[in-house]
């Protein structure tokens, strides 16, 4: 009898130790949508007034939204207007009531540099306000065409507009009721036209074109893309009314033969003449315009890049006759990176000086070339990464640039601002605080607004001068209502990568009723990059799903992995090349193990992982690669098979192999071949070039599934096609595995109005499989 009683007690204790109640009410309380209602603005968005040292901004706190006017020279800040007075004046004029705490004002524009008058819009009405005498009048009504969308691309002084119609390019005089449209092109057709890609199938109506104006508006240029041979991709909108609708679009994939082809065309506005620039160099090359001359319409600088991304050329084009000459080239292995704000090319003095960003030393830095493509000097140098050029002071020949990892002891992902001489170098730090900074500079380069914060330090918004001196405190957020809820800041941590040397930086989210004597399952929120690491470095009260998810009774961690970001160095950034599926997995597992060794409250026997897009791909790969370690994965919109994701992504980050093959040409074909390939000393053997890419996919690992997997995808996702998830589903079914699959009807890559539903289902999934808290309620919010 005693033995039986002992067994029953042990079994009951074991069941209780495994099954814990998830705190759904706390998760609901701290859901992003609920928290964000309790906090106003975090940053000051400075709107500089023409080329002055004055700006205005709006800022919302618990007492409402106010608008401010700042004179940087005078170090002064005042209300742009009194919101209560403004609401009453608007009511008098149009007889409509508005909430004085949150006026729906938009498009504030000062008339000129010296005036104190500005216009703004509410609904379809434009008002004019005089700050001096507080006089408000109705100026005009915004035309319906302006309100409903802009199909016109205006020339710099708004004299001309360009647009597309019937796949072709048109121009006409702006603001002239008698203006006659002028057709510049006649060769446009479907998927080879002059309209922006989303408008390419439109025919009789005017739509936005891909044409761009030279600064003096004498010419336009177009990079025309030929996608006629690119294969179609399809999604079906099952919710379309009255019947499901097929959506067809062009979509090139890694290694495919038929990819978009690009050409450069220049149009002269006065003569209507067309110049086709001979840009051909490499098969399937990429092309973009990097600069056009400002004072004339004579010159432009373009970039052409090999399909395998290992080489590019910067070229000067004579816009009058189309003559092209190479200024300099760049080679980089495994590939040249120039995405997400890096890859700067800036031009000074009408092409006499060219600033170029390169990772040729293993670290991203700036280089100065002359107008003939000769390297003059390296501008920035050291074991850190230079990022965006924020501003160029042409008269003082100084740059204001972002940089990462230059300051000893400062988080290497924090954006810091520096001033550097074009001719002498010598970087000066002008954002001294140990925090993540964002910037807005005046057109005069005399002042800038600095918003800085950390995940564990709320935002501060200040006005600085060009030396970084702090002149005026502008704003700090009102977090009183947030703190009243019991909200707490997350914690930063550092772990090592699997190599035992590389530092990985992350953030930990705990339940707000945290008990250090308890054991908590751990969930890793992941995004592998390689273009960015989805780890927060600035302050937020919600951090998307992580804050709420932790309240269920989890430790949620979010940290980077080798291969995740270009902000460290080229080796770190390209670590995953040729290994796109697996490169981040070992670091994630090893990082969690280190945290479990460091903190007794982390239960490494109960591990979850989740992510969206690349994170959806990575979370499934982790569960299938380390089935003995990860127990549960929620994977949304994952690009599980990068062979059917977009061409740029797979070929850039995993690689594409260029294959050259000598083929014998039949005599009757020689004339045609000569047009396509250069002659090789009259040899009948010609070179054919093809490309091959093969990325390991998640469905190849389906046999390994041991844990719990929830796959989620929008059924009209035209970024990451739902076929990515369905291929994994197919492989899991064939492997006789039990799993869960959810379709979000009518949703694309983001889940739109179903986002909150998805988040709640994720709560249930982790609560059931990590806490053992199984619920039978049908109503999701019957917690």
Ranges and model annotations:
Residues 19-459, 463-464, 669-676, 771, ...:
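Beta-propeller folds
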Residues 4-13:
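Sec-dependent N-terminal signal peptides
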Residues 10, 27, 193-195, 468, ...:
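Glycine-centered structural positions embedded in regular secondary structure
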Residues 7-8, 20, 39, 155, ...:
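Generic alpha-helix initiation/capping and coil-helix boundary signal
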Residues 46, 290, 297, 303, ...:
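Serine-hydrolase catalytic core recognition
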């Amino acid at each position: 009898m005693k033995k039986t009683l002992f067994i029953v007690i042990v079994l009951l204790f074991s069941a209780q130790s495994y099954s814990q109640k998830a705190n759904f009410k706390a998760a609901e309380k701290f859901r992003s949508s609920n928290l964000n209602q309790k906090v106003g603005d975090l940053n000051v968005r400075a709107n500089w007034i023409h080329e002055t040292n004055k700006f205005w901004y709006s800022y919302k706190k618990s007492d409402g939204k106010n608008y401010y006017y700042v004179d940087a020279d005078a170090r002064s800040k005042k209300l742009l207007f009194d919101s209560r007075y403004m609401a009453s004046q608007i009511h008098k004029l149009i007889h409509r009531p508005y909430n004085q705490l949150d006026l729906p004002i938009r498009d504030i524009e000062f008339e000129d540099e010296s005036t104190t008058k500005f216009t703004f819009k509410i609904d379809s009405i434009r008002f004019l306000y005089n700050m001096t005498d507080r006089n408000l009048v109705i100026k005009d009504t915004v035309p319906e065409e302006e309100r409903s969308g802009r199909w016109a691309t205006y020339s710099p002084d708004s004299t001309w507009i360009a647009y597309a119609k019937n796949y072709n390019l048109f121009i006409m005089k702006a603001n002239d009721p008698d203006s006659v449209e002028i057709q510049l092109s006649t060769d446009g057709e479907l998927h080879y036209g002059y309209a922006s890609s989303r408008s390419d199938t439109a025919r009789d109506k005017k739509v936005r074109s891909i044409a761009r104006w030279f600064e003096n508006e004498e010419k336009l240029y177009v990079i025309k893309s030929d996608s006629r041979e690119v294969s179609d991709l399809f999604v079906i909108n099952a919710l379309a009314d009255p019947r499901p609708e097929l959506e067809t679009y062009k979509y090139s994939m890694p290694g495919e033969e038929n990819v978009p082809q690009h050409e450069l065309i220049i149009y002269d506005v006065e003569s209507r003449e067309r110049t086709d620039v001979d840009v051909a160099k490499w098969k399937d090359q990429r092309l973009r315009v990097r600069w056009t001359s400002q004072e004339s319409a004579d010159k432009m600088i373009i970039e052409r890049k090999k399909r395998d991304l290992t080489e590019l050329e910067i070229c000067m084009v004579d816009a009058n006759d189309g003559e092209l000459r190479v200024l300099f080239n760049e080679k980089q292995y495994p590939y040249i990176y120039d995405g997400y704000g890096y890859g700067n090319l800036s031009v000074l003095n009408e092409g006499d000086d060219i600033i170029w960003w390169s990772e040729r030393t293993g670290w991203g830095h700036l280089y100065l070339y002359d107008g003939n493509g000769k390297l003059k000097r390296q501008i920035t140098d050291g074991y850190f990464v230079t990022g965006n050029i924020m501003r160029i002071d042409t008269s003082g020949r100084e740059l204001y640039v972002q940089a990462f990892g230059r300051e000893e002891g400062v988080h290497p992902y924090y954006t810091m601002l520096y001033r550097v001489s074009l001719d002498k170098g010598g970087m000066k730090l002008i954002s001294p605080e140990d925090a993540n900074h964002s910037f807005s500079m005046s057109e005069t380069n005399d002042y800038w607004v600095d918003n800085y914060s950390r995940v564990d330090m709320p935002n501060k918004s200040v006005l600085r001068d060009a030396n970084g001196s702090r002149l005026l405190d502008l704003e700090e957020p009102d977090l009183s209502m947030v703190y009243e809820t019991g909200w707490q800041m997350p914690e930063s941590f550092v772990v090592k990568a699997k190599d035992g040397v590389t530092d990985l930086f992350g953030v930990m989210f705990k339940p707000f009723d945290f008990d250090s004597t308890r054991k908590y399952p751990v969930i890793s929120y992941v995004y592998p990059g390689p273009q960015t690491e989805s780890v927060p470095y600035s302050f937020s009260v919600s951090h998307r799903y992580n804050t709420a998810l932790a309240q269920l009774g989890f430790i949620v961690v979010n940290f980077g992995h080798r291969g995740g970001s270009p902000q460290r160095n080229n080796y770190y950034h390209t670590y995953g090349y040729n290994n796109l599926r697996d490169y981040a997995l070992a670091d994630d597992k090893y990082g969690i193990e280190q945290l479990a060794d460091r903190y007794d409250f982390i239960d490494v026997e109960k591990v979850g992982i989740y992510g969206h897009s690349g994170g959806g791909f990575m979370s499934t790969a982790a569960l299938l690669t380390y089935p003995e370690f990860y127990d549960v994965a929620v994977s949304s919109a994952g690009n599980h098979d990068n062979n059917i994701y977009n061409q740029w992504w797979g070929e850039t980050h995993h690689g594409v192999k260029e294959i050259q093959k000598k083929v014998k040409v039949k005599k009757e074909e020689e004339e045609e071949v000569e047009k396509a390939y250069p002659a090789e000393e009259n040899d009948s053997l010609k070179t054919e070039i093809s490309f091959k890419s093969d990325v390991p996919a998640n469905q190849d690992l389906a046999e390994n599934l041991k844990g719990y997997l929830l796959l989620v995808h929008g059924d009209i996702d035209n970024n990451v096609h739902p076929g990515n998830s369905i291929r994994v589903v197919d492989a899991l079914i064939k492997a006789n595995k039990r799993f869960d699959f959810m379709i979000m009807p009518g949703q694309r890559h983001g889940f739109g109005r179903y986002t909150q539903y998805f988040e709640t289902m994720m709560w249930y999934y982790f609560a059931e499989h990590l806490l053992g808290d199984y619920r039978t309620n049908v109503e999701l919010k019957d917690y």
